Every structure is written in structure tokens, then in C-alpha cells.
Design a protein with these regions (language model features):
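Phosphate/dinucleotide-binding and metal-coordinating scaffold of catalytic cores
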Residues: 1-260, 264-266, 278-386
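Conserved protein-kinase catalytic-loop segment immediately C-terminal to the catalytic Asp
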Residues: 271, 276-278
């Protein structure tokens, strides 16, 4: 058997951090060896990553690669002559570039500068974006590839429109959400906005004959998003609470507001990688809690027609739903709601989900959703129960 290995340099923008080697072992497990260290300052090294830990660095590199369960992952990688298990190849082609942070990995003889390759400022490979969204097309080899470090399972693609970096996220029918996920993102954003929460703004648009939710990038070349999972030794709610408490009361209250909001909209997909903090890339210091995003799997994402027969039918169904974090929405309400969250929820009283200019569910369905939303917010405010 021929064993494959390759050496890379981990860089923070144009600063060399360390040299490492990845081996593709005979048992299919990659091994990483740190060969040389250059600039290991805490202000430069990936935050919350233990300095000089080879196993942790390898896991970090794996996590910034395209998920194996991503929609059209085989089509994306196939267009680049890669496979989903080819970590060395994916790092070589994509250079580990991300829209989350300023890190990248390059081959040891690479001479290019970050300004000419980073995803924040440079043109995307539009043909790969189309493959990522539709599963169809051919790579034309033009532009940087933004799809190799984007998390999530649904079909999605980064686009550059009028100077903004924008994410288009669609809905693959095999996930049995019937095309409702974009509506859910839009309605959830409108509720969070009404509450006064720090939330990513979502719009709706049609691309390649498919409805998509659309949002602008909330990071930039000077500000990173770091998911909360990176800061935890144990992946449970207690650890999350302790982390946000350690940052101060404002951080903790922001976290509590997120948990109450999730309970209100029955967001069953709040996991440890879709919330976190924003980090100043110049100092590697935490700035604030990241804006809320990724609410497509909530009570607004229910395609089954029979659920909309009545408010009672819909409520009976969503009362069977449970959050990823902890064991019930009702317990989260009781544990995380204080006066600030009550004030935020009170702003939803009498609020109606707005119609989009172009793309909408039927009036009957929207009426059911509005009735359910009002019933939930009243129940929470009156009784702290759902």
C-alpha cells in the first residue's frame, strides 16, 4: 500500500503560524504531526485551540471541511476531482479558506498573499456555486471556492451581489420539508426582529427555479465567528451556560434570550455549531455574542397540509417537538426567562407575520401560524409554560 502524506503551512492572513504534515495512514485515519512552530502567540493561534496539540489541530481542520452529509457533496467534490474522504486533497484545492475566520493552509512552497486569495474580497467560482445549489453543472476553474468550508446539510451557495457576500440556502426535497425552510428562516427572522434581538436578516429570492432564503455574511476580514462548541470540554447545556456566564451578564442574557426565542418558535435545531461569539481578528479577543441565524427547522417549517386544518391540530403537533439543547422547551422557558426576556416577548403580542413582497404561503396557513404564535407568547407570558 502506498501511504500518502503532505506538508502544509498554517497561516493567519500572511503570518506563518506553524508547519505540519498530514499522513493518510493504512487504516484510513489521518495523522497530523507539527513539524515547526513560527508564531504561536495567543493573538494569532486559533482561539480555544490548545497550543501545539496535534490531535486538536487535526480535528479543527476536519471541522472546517465540507460536511460529508451536505447536499450535493459528491457533485461538488467530483467537479474538483476530489472525494469526501480526501482531506489532503480538499485542503490543497481549497487552501482551508473560510468565511468564518482569517486562517488558511498552503503548501510549503506557496508564495501568494492573503489579499489575493481570501474569500472576503476575491471573486468566487460561480460554476461551483451553481453545482452546490443545484447539483448540476461543470467547474470552469475560475475564482476561489467558498463551498469547501461551509457547514450544514441543505443545498446552499455563496454569491457576491452588488459588493455583498450573500448566502443562498435552498431546500432539497429528500429532507421532506416541502420547500418550507426558506419561509421558516424569513418568518423566524421577523419574529426575532420584533423582539429586538441581534439576528441575521433573511430575505427570500428565486434562483435556478428554486426558492431560497438569502442573508448577508455577518463576518468580515477583521471579525470571526467561532461556534460555542470550540470553547467546551463537555458538550452539554451546563457547559454552555457556564461559558456564557464567564463572559459576563450581557453575554449570558443574550444567550437566555436566544433560548427563549427558540422555545417560542419551536426551533428544534439549535446545536453547538450554529451559535457562538464574534472575535476580533487583530487581538483574538471575544467581542460579543454572534447574531442569531439558522432557524429553518422551526414551527414555521411544516409542509404537511393536514396540520393546517386548525390551530388545535397544528399546536398538537408542535407540542411533540423537543429542542436539541436540554430536554424540553418548557423547561428552557422556566430556566432562562427573566425580566429582560419578558419584555422582549411582550413585543410579539399582537404582532402578525408579514407577507413577503413576492413569495408567500397561503393566507389560510399564515393565519394558522399567526394564531399559534400568539397563543404561545401569551401562554409563556401568563404562565411561563407552553
Amino acid at each position: 500500500m502506498i501511504l500518502v502524506y503532505k506538508q502544509f503551512i498554517l497561516k493567519n492572513k500572511d503570518i506563518d503560524i506553524l508547519k505540519f504534515k498530514i499522513d493518510d495512514g493504512m487504516y484510513g485515519d489521518y495523522e497530523l504531526t507539527i513539524l515547526e512552530t513560527y508564531n504561536m502567540s495567543p493573538s494569532l493561534y486559533p482561539i480555544a485551540l490548545e497550543n501545539g496539540d496535534s490531535e486538536a489541530l487535526l480535528e479543527w481542520l476536519k471541522q472546517r471541511n465540507i460536511p460529508k452529509n451536505r447536499a450535493f457533496v459528491n457533485e461538488i467534490l467530483g467537479s474538483l476531482e476530489l472525494t469526501r474522504n480526501d482531506l489532503i486533497g480538499i485542503l490543497t484545492v481549497g487552501k482551508g479558506l473560510s468565511l468564518n475566520d482569517p486562517y488558511w493552509v498552503v503548501e510549503t512552497d506557496f508564495k501568494g498573499e492573503y489579499k489575493n486569495y481570501n474569500l472576503y474580497d476575491n471573486a468566487f467560482n460561480e460554476s461551483i456555486a451553481e453545482i452546490a445549489f443545484t447539483g448540476r453543472g461543470r467547474n470552469d476553474g475560475v475564482g476561489n471556492i467558498a463551498e469547501l468550508s461551509t457547514n450544514g446539510t441543505l443545498n446552499k451557495a455563496w454569491r457576491r451581489i452588488d459588493g455583498d457576500v450573500v448566502l443562498y440556502k435552498g431546500n432539497v426535497q429528500r429532507y421532506n420539508t416541502g420547500g418550507y425552510e426558506p419561509y421558516a428562516e424569513y418568518y423566524a427572522y421577523k419574529v426575532a426582529e420584533q423582539m429586538g434581538l441581534n439576528v441575521v436578516a433573511y430575505d427570500l429570492d428565486m434562483w435556478h427555479c428554486q426558492l431560497a432564503s438569502v442573508c448577508k455574511l455577518f463576518t468580515n476580514i477583521d471579525t470571526s465567528f467561532v461556534p460555542v462548541s470550540r470553547f467546551l470540554k463537555r458538550f452539554n447545556l451546563r457547559s454552555v451556560v457556564e461559558f456564557y456566564r464567564s463572559l459576563g451578564d450581557e453575554f449570558y442574557q443574550d444567550f437566555c434570550s436566544m433560548m427563549v426565542f427558540d422555545a417560542l418558535i419551536c426551533n428544534v435545531d439549535r446545536h453547538l455549531n450554529n451559535f457562538g461569539v464574534l472575535v476580533d481578528n487583530r487581538t483574538n479577543k471575544i467581542k460579543c455574542m454572534a447574531p442569531l441565524f439558522d432557524h429553518g427547522n422551526c414551527m414555521f417549517n411544516k409542509p404537511k397540509e393536514d396540520l393546517y386544518e386548525s390551530t388545535y391540530t397544528f399546536e398538537k403537533h408542535i407540542n411533540t417537538l423537543y429542542p436539541t439543547l436540554w430536554n424540553s422547551f418548557e423547561k428552557n422557558i422556566k430556566y432562562f426567562m427573566s425580566e429582560r426576556q419578558r419584555q422582549e416577548l411582550s413585543r410579539v403580542l399582537g404582532f402578525a407575520l408579514p407577507k413577503h413582497d413576492k413569495y408567500n404561503v397561503s393566507d389560510d396557513k399564515l393565519n394558522v401560524l399567526n394564531h399559534v404564535l400568539q397563543n404561545r407568547v401569551k401562554s409563556i407570558l401568563d404562565n411561563c409554560v407552553l
